[in-house]
Structures are given as structure tokens and as C-alpha cells.
Amino acid sequence: RRQRQMCIRDKDKRRLGDVVDLFTNIQMIEHGSEKDILGRTYEYCLSMFAEQEGKRGGEFFTPSCVVRTLVEVLKPFKGRVYDPCCGSGGMFVQSAKFVENHSGNISNISIYGQDSNPTTWKMAQMNLAIRGIEPDLGTYAADTFLDDRHPTLRADYIMANPPFNLSDWGLDKLKEDQRWKYGIPPVSYTHLRAHETTLHL
């Protein structure tokens, strides 16, 4: 049974890769309504895959209702927006929508982020490209805590849904890291790692 579940997961990952490749090969659309339809279609594909993955799908997809709430609270009209574990880029997409819906200028916000999963990182790049958003997600997929691609960044807005309850997140390699201003996070409290990282920015 376990082998069958692994086989199904592998097939699902291949399907996800096919979806990403499909959108990668689509010529970018400049017109607003058509571009919005393409973006919504891509977002729908991501949500369906996340739903099928269940708990594991949360590593790249945060429910849109949660993202909208975060953005409405922060109101990122202008400045640098950062997500250290950006997944498929939902935080960035919603930030851009917020600016547009309030008659703001999308060029007034700068997008920064990264993700450790190469497929997810590619998904984020495409999710943003479809909507005409030019982000800085680093030149390759990388773990924020072990390989920070934006070490000098000082963000104005930080939104994140970081991975929790990781048993091994590389603490032994980061004991002297400058981000631990308030103390080294215990191995069993991985959420503190994310909190201290955002406070450092």
C-alpha cells in the first residue's frame, strides 16, 4: 500500500511539472482581462493540486482567504515586500491585486523572496510572470535559513507561511548566525526560527 501511495505521489508531481511546463510555454498576454483569466487558471490548478496533496500541499500553497487577510491588514501600497518561504508566490500575487484594486501603482512595490523546493520556486516564477510581476526570487531555489539569497535586504512588509515542526533545520550550522539577536531558537521550536529571521529584516 505504501508503495502504491508513493507511486501516486510521483505521478501527481509529474502532473504538476507538466502544468508548470504548459504555462511556461504559453506566450505572455499583455491585455488585462486575458492576463487575469490566465492567472486565475494557474491559481486554480495550484489550489486543486494542493487540495489533492492535503497537508503536504501547504508547503507551496496558502489558502487565498488567509493571504487576502494578511494583505488587507498590512496594506502594502509602497515598498519592499518579502516572503522568505514564498511557495508558489501567492502572497506576492495578492499584494499586487491589493495595489491595483486600490488604484495604486504596482511599480511602487518591489517583490523579494525565495523557496527551497526547485519545482515550487519555478511555480512562483511562472505565477508572477503570468501577471506581469517582476520579482527577485534569487537565481536558484535555496533554503532561506541555510542559504539566504537576500542578506542585505531590509523589507517594509514581510508575509510568510513558513514550514513548522521540522526536526532538522540545520541549527548546528547556524549557531553563530547574526539573525539570532534574541537567542538561538531551540531545535524543537522551529517557528521561533522564522520569527527571529523576520525580526532581523
Per-region residue spans from a language model:
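Non-catalytic, mostly N-terminal accessory regions of nucleic-acid modification and defense proteins
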Residues: 1-5, 9-77, 136-149
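N-terminal functional modules and adjacent low-complexity/disordered segments of proteins
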Residues: 11, 44, 118, 177-179
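Alpha-helix N-cap/helix-start and coil->helix boundary motif
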Residues: 38-39, 89, 118, 198
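Conserved S-adenosyl-L-methionine
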Residues: 56-160, 165-176
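Short, small-residue-biased leader/transition segments that mark boundaries at the very start
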Residues: 3-8, 194-197, 201
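A short, gly/pro- and small-residue-rich
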Residues: 175-185
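Conserved Class I SAM-dependent methyltransferase catalytic core
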Residues: 188-193
